[in-house]
A protein has these predicted regions:
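Intrinsically disordered, low-complexity, compositionally biased regions/tails
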Residues: 10, 74, 123-126, 139
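Short beta-strand edge/turn micro-motifs at domain boundaries
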Residues: 126-134, 138, 142-177
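Short, charged low-complexity linear motifs
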Residues: 19-21, 120
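Amphipathic alpha-helices that form helix-helix packing interfaces
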Residues: 34-37
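N-terminal amphipathic/basic-hydrophobic helices that include classical n-h-c signal peptides
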Residues: 1-17
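Membrane-proximal amphipathic alpha-helices
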Residues: 23-27
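A solvent-exposed, acidic/Ser-Thr-rich amphipathic alpha-helical stretch
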Residues: 32, 44-123
Length: 177
């Protein structure tokens, strides 16, 4: 069993007979796993503190993201200035759990008490072992508060057939005045 402070979630592992072509079902499963990981990060923080949350977030980054494939394009919802785009794994980790001097503006999106994450597809594009998805992701916190963001993910299957996030872009919906 993976080390994840007791708040594990399933990662996508393809079997040997799976096609290299990414399916819509795999995209849906990847979004569900990502949401489950975010909830696991929140619960580990609430129950065991920042070190446990960091452990779960590291596991999520290792299993869901493609940092071992090359540059992951990561743009968090609430980021700006010189740190708008996170070009390193450390930058992505800081966004999820905060508590780092290198990213003082990050309060830790993953430790906001999330209880549910639901995605709604606007469109997806699949070309073999690469896929892109965009839509809305709704987060519900422990008090019933709702946050809805515009989200895009890009995925690539690695050599083992595991779907990995290589693009993560999130923004708040446009609010006309």
């Amino acid at each position: 069993m993976p080390v994840c402070a007791g708040y594990c979630f399933t990662s996508i592992i393809a079997d040997e007979e799976m096609s290299s072509e990414i399916t819509e079902q795999e995209l849906a499963t990847a979004r569900k796993i990502w949401g489950d990981a975010l909830v696991a990060i929140s619960k580990s923080f609430e129950n065991e503190g920042i070190d446990a949350a960091r452990e779960v977030a590291n596991y999520a980054l290792d299993t869901a993201y493609g940092f071992d494939l090359g540059q992951v394009l990561f743009k968090p919802t609430m980021a700006g200035g010189e740190q708008t785009f996170r070009t390193t794994r450390e930058g992505a980790l800081a966004y999820f759990v905060g508590h780092t001097d290198e990213y003082p503006g990050d309060s830790g999106f993953g430790i906001k008490g999330w209880r549910s994450v639901v995605s709604e597809t606007a469109a997806s594009f699949v070309d073999g072992d690469v896929a892109m998805w965009m839509g809305w992701v709704t987060f519900i916190d422990k008090d019933g508060g709702i946050t809805k963001v515009d989200k895009s993910w890009g995925y690539k299957k690695d050599e083992a057939g595991t779907l990995r996030i290589v693009l993560h872009h999130s923004s708040l919906p446009y609010q006309p005045e």
